[in-house]
């Protein structure tokens, strides 16, 4: 049955004449005011290529909604560009922006009594932020990803932004010249759109499809593709059907839908940030999802997609062979997906995949069969142990290391760790510990890409890293993040000392500090938290409200 509309209570009837007067001021006619009023929430910013073009996409989405008999009004949300903030105070605002985006969409939607929602995003936190709002609002909603950039090239090598970060380390280690670094910088990201590898933005775009919240095939076309425009228009049109049939976001965002998304994440070897974001979206949808669900699904799901940074290909390559539905179909045929879940098409996942038009081209070089995987286990593993009682995350798709034991080299900030790598303090065989970079400690749980890229770029191939911060989706190597509890709240990572032995054991799903329980307890008794880095402003407010990484680092009422 049709969804109950919000807009009549705000815009119909004698007493709402002042409200209608304002709608007339922006060009709506009597006929348009009488139609369902829908929001186009657009994460738009000129501060970077990821969301530079989304305002234009919003205009296309409006055309699609009008074709479906709806009256659209667009509004922007904020965007924090992760790459520009990387390695600076700006990165502390990245994860914060996810929850701010969710709050902004909620506020705009409810304040203006919209009936349905189209969300358009690009950079890392925009997709989960908008999906969190959709889950929270529980209204007819559909998402469209803005698309990735085309890859760059230099000296016959295909480039992504990951190569620029690692080139800095290579230059500092005198492995390349300054001119080579400059040429890589100029060529790595040649168009509008998000980072081209399967980093966080493309991972979350893929998750929007796997959750059933986006049209099949819509995540993979590049930002510059004409098919991107087509998908945006069709997304706008599809909202009309959702409203007509009364399909709301929580009808789609079920526990089974999240299992499908986690399965897809594991099969594609996507970003560890997706663990945080899926937990957060599930929280807003009222779905009980835990880190244990990720490991349970990881064990049964093979890693089959050779996507950068763990593999060889970028999103544009996946698009050429059929996009995310190619991965989903292989998983469905292997009995690894719930085919009966509802999606934004009004059809089930199985129906979508049966009706999707797959290109008649080879794809096994990018997406393998489930019976011939790259690795038998999914691309992400959750570790627990004496160093991470509530959990930590490692991306095994981006490393072949299954066990690492080494002496700790401890730093209390990302900046100190970066200087340590630069100055040669970090030696082969060591485990770099970066703490007080968690949700409350940093605050904002920044990504450690500057440090991990410096390690890789310097040729330190036998160094691991453990942090209560996050990693960029571009990170590769034996890097463990999201350690919970974090140092700021007295997690065991707070009492690690230089020279302590750290054990990372993927097969046993363990992350341990090789000390006796008694010694750990004694050190924790002697520990006291440092003063907060921020005592006022947004980051101080965020630190007071945010939960631990093991719970999705969502902000909750105090």
Swiss-Prot record:
It is an enzyme of class 4 (lyase). [2Fe-2S] cluster binds at residues 50, 123, 195. Pathway: Amino-acid biosynthesis; L-isoleucine biosynthesis; L-isoleucine from 2-oxobutanoate: step 3/4; Amino-acid biosynthesis; L-valine biosynthesis; L-valine from pyruvate: step 3/4. It comes from the Archaea. Binds 1 [2Fe-2S] cluster per subunit. This cluster acts as a Lewis acid cofactor. The keyword Transcription does not apply. The active site is at 472 (proton acceptor). It holds the Pfam family ILV_EDD_C. Mg(2+) binds at residues 82, 124-125, 447. It catalyses: (2R)-2,3-dihydroxy-3-methylbutanoate = 3-methyl-2-oxobutanoate + H2O; (2R,3R)-2,3-dihydroxy-3-methylpentanoate = (S)-3-methyl-2-oxopentanoate + H2O. Its EC number is 4.2.1.9. Functions in the biosynthesis of branched-chain amino acids. Catalyzes the dehydration of (2R,3R)-2,3-dihydroxy-3-methylpentanoate (2,3-dihydroxy-3-methylvalerate) into 2-oxo-3-methylpentanoate (2-oxo-3-methylvalerate) and of (2R)-2,3-dihydroxy-3-methylbutanoate (2,3-dihydroxyisovalerate) into 2-oxo-3-methylbutanoate (2-oxoisovalerate), the penultimate precursor to L-isoleucine and L-valine, respectively. Belongs to the IlvD/Edd family. This is Dihydroxy-acid dehydratase. It comes from Saccharolobus islandicus (strain M.14.25 / Kamchatka #1). The gene is ilvD.
